Amino acid sequence: MPALLKRLLFQVGPHPNERTFTLSSVSTDGHYISLRPFVKPSGDELSFPFEWAFAGTNETVKANDQGNGVVTQDFNFWLDTNVYLNVPNTHRGEVNTTWKNWDSGCVEETGAVYPFGADKESVSFRELWQPVDPSREDLVIVSPNNEKFSSNARSIVLKVTDEAYDGLVIVIGRWIQGFLSQKNNNTIEGLNFIRLLEKDSGKSEFLLSYGKEVNKIPQSYENLKKGSTVTSNGLNWEVIEYHA
């Protein structure tokens, strides 16, 4: 079933913190995107106000159920903004993570990255996630007792098919997140992100819009079917998943 997760905590070292409004979308078929914009960017962050963003299709993640509410997930991201921008001391290659369900309904993610090289010292991290109901306009907590709400949410995924771009849009219930990146650019000028919320009125509200080419990202998701093509300002997107 699809999932929408809000991050509550991020920890590297002894001091936990959370400076972002991070939402991760996971489709029914396992495609995913995580956008992590700063709440109060400052200084150099103003030009690119994101801690990080990544995305991928289900071909870029391997998930294994370990039992007792524990799942391992190994990612080879399609988009990794740190890699795209050639940020110094960036982990490259597969990221191994472990996800543990808490009785409260929260999900703890732990793992380690190797920013200085695979043969160098690792850096451990910890994140805490709260599942929210994607069929609601407000951020309503999903507990173990009401997961039926999220299981009934629509799950639609579009992927760009143009040779000059990579792109993915994931619609989970009312919540939409997407990215579009220019191939072979590797600067912030080549990155575009959206986060949309469909309101009770039927209109969509931009919660996040970044980049000079966001108008090439589809922003209407009616009358679609799997395998169909959507054109947005000259850019073709294929519907690779449709559950509604």
From Swiss-Prot:
Keywords: Cytoplasm, Nucleus, Phosphoprotein. The keyword Transferase does not apply. The modification Phosphoserine is found at residue 143. Signal peptide: none annotated. It is found in: Cytoplasm; Nucleus. One of its GO terms (cellular component) is nucleus. GO terms for biological process: protein targeting to membrane. It holds the Pfam family HRI1. Unknown. Non essential. Interacts with HRR25. May interact with SEC72. Belongs to the HRI1 family. Present with 15400 molecules/cell in log phase SD medium. This is Protein HRI1. It comes from Saccharomyces cerevisiae (strain ATCC 204508 / S288c) (Baker's yeast). The gene is HRI1.
